[in-house]
Amino acid sequence: MRLLNSQQASFEQELTELLAFETVNDPALLATVDDIIAQVRQGGDEVVLKLTQQFDNHPAKTFAELEISQEKLKQAFDGLNPTIKQALELAAQRVTSFHERQRQESWTYQDALGNTLGQQVTPLDKVGIYVPGGLASYPSSVLMNALPAKVAGVGQIIMVVPAPHGELNPLVLAAAYLAGVDKVFTIGGAQAVAALAYGTNTIPQVDKITGPGNKYVAAAKRAVFGQVGIDMIAGPSEVLVYAEGVTNDKADWLAMDLLSQAEHDTVAQAIFVTPSEPLLKKVAQEIEKALVDLPKADIAKAAIANRGALILVKDRAEGIEVINRIAPEHLELSVDDPEAMVKDVRHAGAIFMGRYTPEAIGDYCAGPNHVLPTSGTARFSSPLGVYDFQKKSSIIYCSEQGSQMLAKTADILAVEENLDAHARSARYRVK
């Protein structure tokens, strides 16, 4: 795990190198994805089935076998262990409760001329959600993508989830049932994204695609953007943990919080920032100790070797500068006064405040969404939310008096822009 010191002359260059990561712009990858999209547009269901057999080793002989019925979703939910079912239901309730507070409403007002102006908020008609699949899959991703869409009032939710060798975690199906997903197809990769974006005989064409996936999924989402909306181009998972080395800091807690992201992927990023050199050394030691019996130690070791870092800063102010420069997906402020510190944090996907708020709680059941901007995009992006599944139309309703007054202004400006038909259209309203 590399060590960076903000007081060293090389710090800026080292930090830039640490944050440099891009997989979606690989020319070979993009060419492969473009070819898959073209095949799906041309061949529809038949091509999607063929590619699913090829890439996922799925045993399906017909496309119909790739769709999971509502009956099977209900069976998966009803068959859950009671403890797991209760946990899933609690998570769903909390996610729903949080996102209900995000719902935007239509509004209007009347100006002095009697014109009615406003904004009409409507849900999207159809959305596609991509859920990573296989036996080691993520029911939490189902809840985090589907429930905000449900709260927004989306008409139809179509879920795609890869099932390598035809195997799928029943908990994912149970989560789909609980979240009210309308259709589920066991397909994945760029072919699933293409099918959602352009539609096939069986898969409805959607208006927007959300959810994380591998580099092929990310590249495909970028490629179809414009044909459909997308939530974001998701990169590898990230966490930045900040602590200051006071008596209450538990180095083993901090180390495990870092590893909770490192175990996701060999290119996940775990960064620890502190002004305390003794704490930095303790955390480094605790990481090594924790790796001894961590089931996914090989993945975590590779992640911290590839993209992990321990960063020593001069003080809190400098720590905040580093945080805002990195704009992490997940930020933990493990300090006594996180309320004071958070005011200066401008860029982070989700902020976990205090020592008793591990990122893992946010992944599952705190309530806020765990689909977050990565790769520094928290500088201009937000977590997935209800607002991603709603759109706005401007409302303009002129009174006769208001139209005559505003038409004069429109006429003048249209003439200056040399748009004569615009000017005449406005002029016709003036008595």
Predicted regions and their residues:
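C-terminal core of ALDH-fold dehydrogenases
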Residues: R325-K431
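Short loop-to-beta-strand entry elements in the cores of soluble alpha/beta enzymes
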Residues: P212, M232-A243, Q261-A284, A300-I311, ...
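Conserved NAD(P)+-binding/catalytic subdomain of aldehyde/semialdehyde dehydrogenases
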Residues: G180-Q269
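Flexible, glycine/charged-enriched surface loops at secondary-structure junctions
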Residues: Q104-Y109, G229, A268-V273, D293-I304, ...
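N-terminal Rossmann-like NAD(P)+-binding subdomain of aldehyde/semialdehyde dehydrogenases
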Residues: M1-D125
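Conserved small-residue-rich beta-alpha loop and adjacent elements
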Residues: Y109-A174
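Short acidic-hydrophobic, aromatic-tinged amphipathic segments that line or gate anion-handling sites
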Residues: R2-A9, K183-G188, L310-D315
